[in-house]
């Protein structure tokens, strides 16, 4: 029984997240339904990062097992044909060893958070950015972000319903940059870690936003982390600005 690794891109706006639910549309359900329509088999997908409702992906990775040894380009093209018109694309398919696990074999995950920083409304990207109309200082945000790097208890930045056994995580990257293209002003937060807590990236983004408008200092952010003072964090940044951008394997 061959195991297939899929690289997947999707717009999270119409979905209630990755994970299959009984009555709501999800990315997992869409792909598994396409697999059944294509192969006649019932397969269960395992992904690298289970994204929440409204969160996007440009390089999600998942694996599944099928009884038949299909050509990988056939798997890719057949799934894409059966996924239309849903905003989900299979970018590639390859056969991998049975030992490969899209979730447990991952050594690093990468996310990007986008903030549209202007007063005029977002005409084209409203489902992919968090619009903050007041001025933000990206350099102040970056300085505050550096205080979150390393191995810490991230209790202040986890959802109340987070099911992780431990709040300890090692944040390897958290960079904040401003992108300017004419009148286009976007702040991009790029972050990497082996794993993240539920809502961790969005919670950090909301807190860094407060640093950007000078309501929190870098020292304040460090103190929030050290004390677990969740009430001092910024708002939970909306899901629409978050994108799963990649995953590393050994």
Curated annotation (Swiss-Prot):
Name listed for the protein in its UniProt record: tRNA pseudouridine synthase A
One Pfam entry name: PseudoU_synth_1
Active site per UniProt: 52 (nucleophile)
Keyword Isomerase: yes
Record SUPFAM superfamilies: Pseudouridine synthase (SSF55120)
Keyword Isomerase tagged: yes
Enzyme Commission number(s) from the entry: 5.4.99.12
Amino acids binding substrate: 111
Subunit structure: Homodimer.
Entry function: Formation of pseudouridine at positions 38, 39 and 40 in the anticodon stem and loop of transfer RNAs.
Broad class of enzyme this protein falls into: isomerase
Recorded family membership: Belongs to the tRNA pseudouridine synthase TruA family.
Domain of life where this protein originates: Bacteria
Catalytic activity: uridine(38/39/40) in tRNA = pseudouridine(38/39/40) in tRNA
GO-annotated biological processes: tRNA pseudouridine synthesis
MF terms in GO: RNA binding; tRNA pseudouridine(38-40) synthase activity
The entry's keywords: Isomerase, tRNA processing
């Amino acid at each position: 029984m061959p195991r297939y690794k899929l690289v997947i891109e999707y717009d999270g706006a119409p979905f209630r997240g990755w994970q299959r639910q009984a009555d709501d549309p999800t990315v997992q359900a869409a792909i598994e339904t396409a697999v059944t329509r294509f192969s006649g088999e019932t397969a269960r997908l395992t992904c690298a990062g289970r994204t929440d409702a409204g969160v996007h992906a440009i390089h999600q990775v998942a694996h599944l097992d099928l009884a038949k040894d299909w050509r990988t380009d056939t798997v890719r093209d057949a799934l894409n044909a059966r996924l239309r018109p849903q905003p989900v694309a299979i970018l590639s398919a390859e056969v991998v060893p049975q030992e490969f696990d899209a979730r447990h074999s991952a050594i690093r995950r990468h996310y990007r958070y986008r903030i549209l920083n202007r007063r005029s409304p977002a005409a084209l990207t409203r489902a992919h950015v968090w619009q903050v109309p007041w001025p933000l200082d990206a350099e102040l945000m970056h300085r505050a972000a550096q205080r979150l790097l390393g191995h810490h208890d991230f209790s202040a930045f986890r959802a109340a319903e987070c099911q992780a056994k431990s709040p300890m995580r090692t944040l390897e990257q958290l960079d904040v940059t401003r992108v300017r293209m004419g009148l286009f002003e976007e702040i991009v937060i790029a972050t990497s870690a082996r794993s993240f807590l539920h809502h961790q990236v969005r919670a950090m983004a909301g807190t860094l936003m407060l640093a950007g408008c000078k309501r929190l200092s870098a020292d304040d952010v460090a103190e929030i982390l050290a004390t677990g003072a969740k009430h001092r964090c910024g708002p939970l940044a909306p899901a629409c600005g978050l994108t799963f951008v990649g995953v590393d394997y050994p």
